[in-house]
Regions:
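Residue-level detector of Asp-centered blade-edge/turn motifs that repeat once per structural unit
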Residues: 11-12, 76-77, 156-157, 220-221, ...
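Signature of short aromatic-glycine-proline-rich micro-motifs recurring in repeat-based ectodomains
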Residues: 1-8, 63-73, 137-153, 207-217, ...
Length: 317
């Protein structure tokens, strides 16, 4: 994979899917599949082969999934694959989008299909004012050319889409925006939720400790979310955990805390951690590292929790 920027598993943990940030050949990026002989153990992976890849060809080499791809998710039933794009240039107007590919059987990405010209299968330009401004996450006061989509996730019913923007340059900052889809997983029905959203970075404030956000994931019950970043200084290679008062609603939340990713055996904490996901049990967490092109696996002592003192009682699980 070229610069892995997203990771996901099937529910059984026997398949791992990796998104390449940029194409190795041709015009479009791709998603690769690996088989795991031991569920959720990435050390047991074997490459499924080029024939099992999903080439992200939507027929548009100008605003399609060609490069700067970030994050991948599946619909709750595994019949839809989603990928995000967010350019890294100084002017990425019309660059931030989410794309949907349909599958003929659950988690079989070799069958991925994008009907050319279908509005259902791609968001409109997420850099438009009406999809960026007016929420609790704040309004960017300069032209929307440096928002930089870096992650996304859906509610279980497919009617909420959460998009993580890393931001770049003066007056741009990391934000999590919440969108409503009036039809489940229909990306053409998108609208911003103005009474929700989280501003994740605010001039180095300890209350919003996320700089250069790079990945997003929600717990299955929608009551927690995590953001990975690899900014500089105090923002270096961290994961922030946020609890939501209402499932899959960012209108009211608590920042539980932030942990620095531990150093691995070779002394590298993952210079460029980006994609983020968990095992079905919540006892393993995974990040991609697009600097060294590998996947890092972490064991957790509490399901879907990385902050000391925030593990729920057994009866709550």
């Amino acid at each position: 994979n070229n610069d892995p920027s997203g990771v996901h598993f099937n529910p059984a943990g026997t398949k791992m899917f990796i998104l390449s940030q940029s194409p190795d050949t041709g015009d479009f990026s791709h998603v690769s599949e690996y088989n795991l002989s031991t569920p959720f153990d990435v050390s047991t992976k074997t490459y499924a082969g080029n024939g099992e890849r999903c080439i992200l060809d939507n027929g548009e080499d100008d605003v399609g999934p060609t490069s700067w791809m970030h994050d991948l998710k599946f619909s709750h039933n595994g019949m839809m694959l989603f990928v995000g794009r967010g350019n890294a240039g100084s002017d990425n107007a019309n660059g931030d989008r989410v794309f949907r590919f349909d599958l003929t059987s659950p988690y079989d990405i070799s069958t991925c299909n994008f009907p050319v010209g279908s509005a259902v299968h791609a968001t409109s330009n997420l850099d438009d004012d009406d999809l960026q401004d007016g929420s609790n996450a704040g309004t960017v006061t300069v032209p929307h050319t440096k928002n930089r989509l870096r992650g996304f996730d859906f509610s279980n019913d497919g009617k909420r889409l959460f998009v993580l923007f890393g931001g770049a340059g003066s007056n741009h900052y990391s934000r999590l925006l919440e969108y409503q889809l009036s039809i489940s997983y229909d990306l053409s029905t998108i609208s911003i939720v103005t009474d929700a959203g989280i501003r994740l970075q605010d001039s180095g404030s300890d209350d919003t400790p996320v700089g250069n956000a790079k990945g997003l994931d929600f717990s299955p019950d929608g009551k927690k979310l995590w953001v990975v970043d690899h900014g500089g200084g105090i923002y270096d290679r961290d994961i922030t955990q946020i609890s939501l008062d209402v499932a899959f609603s960012t209108s009211s939340y608590t920042i539980d805390g932030t942990v620095e990713l531990p150093v691995t055996g070779d002394g590298n904490a993952g210079l460029q951690p980006s994609g983020l996901t968990f095992s079905t049990s919540g006892l393993k967490m995974y990040t991609t590292n697009d600097e060294d092109e590998d996947i890092l696996e972490y064991n957790l002592v509490c399901p879907f929790n990385i902050i000391s003192g925030r593990c729920p009682a057994i009866t709550d699980n």
